[in-house]
């Protein structure tokens, strides 16, 4: 039976969220391909309500000729609703953080991700086709029992990572830099699995061995008050209070200012299904030093230095290398430009269009 409608279902349609933005981009692509397409969400940010409909309205269209494409990244009752419905089903998998990386600090989040991984397995028998945004994620799909899979990166407008920096933040960062010192940057949620404690250890070692004026800027909101407090105490114990900034949630212009002022992007995360800030760093031609774990080496490839472990002295040496070697910085900048071609929106749109048309035709 031919498919004339592909509707996406997502647990939460959030603003300034890579998966939420991808979902809207995919809806627009599906409509351009001639499919009827809407988004149904369990929850939505106030400024995203108009982009879709509550999942309670999912039954307003007939199942015949319709595909439900579920955006899977967390445990949610929405997944159970999709699984029980009679439409053909596709899944777009963005990975789910293993519970053992978060549950000691956030038991409730540990329960959510365990639920999500159980749903990943439960959806496999009823899913015809699954898309992963990295090869790492596709291997997890295969292990969970999905038979027909493909790797396609997130639909992202790379131009959206550019723009004018916030003048207030830019001025503050420039004043600090005028006093000397390297600026290290990490962008991402403050969460145990993101490895901010390892970043702080690396900064301490880098200051001791190479640059006593170096600073670390951690940009992103916290999802664990307990972990955030522990990090702040750790910073105090190491006497780094003046050298570590927890910037919290920032707007787009403020984020641009942090990227523009940074000398190195450092990622020591314990788990990443893709890691969009790596692409942001490439757009800004910011050298990357990263722990080679999960999807990180696949996303970075030759556009950064990837390390086999997070031993502070090794990380510090890598940072010193990219800061002090102009030729290496130019090589990495050129590699970033080349790597970004893989993620160019027109190219990824073509991949999604071809893959979904083929899956619907089966």
Residues of each region from the PLM?
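A conserved mid-protein helix/loop that constitutes part of the nucleotide-sugar donor-binding site
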Residues: 21, 182, 191-205, 226-229, ...
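Glycosyltransferase donor-sugar binding loop
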Residues: 41-45, 215-232
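Donor nucleotide-sugar binding/catalytic pocket of nucleotide-sugar-dependent glycosyltransferases
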Residues: 124-174
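Nucleotide-activated donor-binding/catalytic signature segment of Leloir-type glycosyltransferases, i.e.
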Residues: 220, 228-250
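Short alpha-helical donor nucleotide-sugar binding micro-motif in glycosyltransferases
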Residues: 250, 257-262
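Aromatic "clamp/platform" in nucleotide-sugar-dependent glycosyltransferases that forms part
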Residues: 270
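Short hydrophobic beta-strand element within catalytic cores of glycosyltransferases
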Residues: 278, 287-290
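Conserved acidic donor-binding segment of nucleotide-sugar-dependent glycosyltransferases
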Residues: 292, 305-313, 321-326
């Amino acid at each position: 039976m031919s498919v004339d409608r592909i509707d996406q279902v997502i647990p939460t349609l959030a603003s300034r969220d890579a998966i939420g933005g991808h979902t809207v981009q995919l809806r627009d692509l599906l409509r351009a391909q001639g499919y009827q397409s809407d988004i149904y969400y369990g929850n939505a940010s106030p400024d995203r309500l108009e982009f879709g409909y509550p999942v309670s309205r999912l039954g307003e269209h007939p199942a015949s000729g319709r595909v439900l494409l579920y955006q899977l990244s967390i445990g949610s009752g929405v997944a159970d609703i999709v699984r029980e419905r009679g439409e053909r089903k596709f899944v777009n998998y963005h990975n789910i953080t293993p519970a053992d990386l978060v549950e000691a600090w956030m038991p409730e989040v540990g329960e959510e991700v365990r639920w999500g991984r159980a749903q990943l397995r439960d959806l496999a028998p009823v899913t015809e086709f699954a898309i992963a945004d990295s090869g790492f994620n596709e291997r997890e799909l295969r292990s969970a029992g999905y038979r027909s899979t493909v790797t396609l990166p997130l639909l992202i407008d790379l131009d959206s990572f550019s723009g004018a920096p916030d003048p207030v933040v830019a001025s503050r960062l420039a004043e600090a830099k005028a006093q000397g010192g390297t600026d290290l940057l990490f962008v991402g949620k403050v969460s145990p699995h993101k490895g901010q404690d390892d970043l702080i250890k690396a900064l301490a070692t880098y200051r001791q061995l190479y640059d006593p004026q170096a600073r670390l800027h951690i940009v992103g909101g916290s999802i664990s008050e307990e972990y955030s407090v522990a990090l702040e105490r750790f910073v105090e114990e190491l006497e780094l209070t003046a050298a570590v900034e927890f910037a919290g949630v920032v707007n787009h212009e403020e984020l641009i200012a942090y990227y523009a002022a940074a000398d190195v992007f450092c990622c020591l995360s314990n788990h990443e299904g893709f890691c969009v800030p790596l692409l942001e760093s490439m757009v800004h031609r910011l050298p990357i030093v990263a722990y080679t774990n999960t999807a990180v080496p696949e996303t970075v490839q030759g556009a950064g230095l990837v390390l086999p472990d997070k031993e502070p002295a090794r990380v510090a040496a890598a940072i010193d290398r990219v800061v002090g070697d102009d030729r290496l910085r130019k090589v990495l900048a050129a590699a970033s430009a080349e790597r970004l071609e893989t993620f160019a929106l027109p190219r990824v749109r073509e991949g999604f269009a071809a893959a979904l048309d083929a899956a619907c035709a089966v």
